[in-house]
């Protein structure tokens, strides 16, 4: 924030990043917001234009708790990371880790690093072995 000498901007990401010149940042970060933008592919392309690398994180809809809720309740899951009911959520593009990996492959986005964690931002053996089932938060470095 400003008191820590960090510039903070608030803007509509769906309108793009036109106010920034190409390659004006080393990193561009999209934290826990991918699921709320209208055109994720366009935004990631814009982020890659503006920054040398980007960091994207999102809640994993493939986590076992979401699957259990859908299976047994037959309703869209409500979790710590996705706390809204389907009818009042800002989320419009929920995805799993596997969905995002395929999305990156299909769009030639090169993932250079990934970190899959639980809601406390801790990695475990299970999040490493079966990330799509046990990871709650996915973070990717892309160039």
Report residues per predicted region.
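S-adenosyl-L-methionine-dependent methyltransferase catalytic module, highlighting the catalytic core
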Residues: 41-46, 53-143
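Alpha-helix C-terminal capping/helix-to-coil transition sites in glycosyltransferase folds
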Residues: 23-24, 50
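Short, hinge-like loop/turn segments at secondary-structure boundaries
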Residues: 5-9, 26-29, 71-75, 130-132
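Short beta->alpha connector loops
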Residues: 14-15, 34-39, 120-122
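Short glycine/proline-enriched coil/turn segments at helix->beta-strand junctions
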Residues: 3-7, 49-54
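Conserved SAM-binding strand-loop segment of SAM-dependent methyltransferases
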Residues: 4-20
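A short SAM/SAH-binding and catalytic strip from SAM-dependent methyltransferases
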Residues: 26-40, 58-59
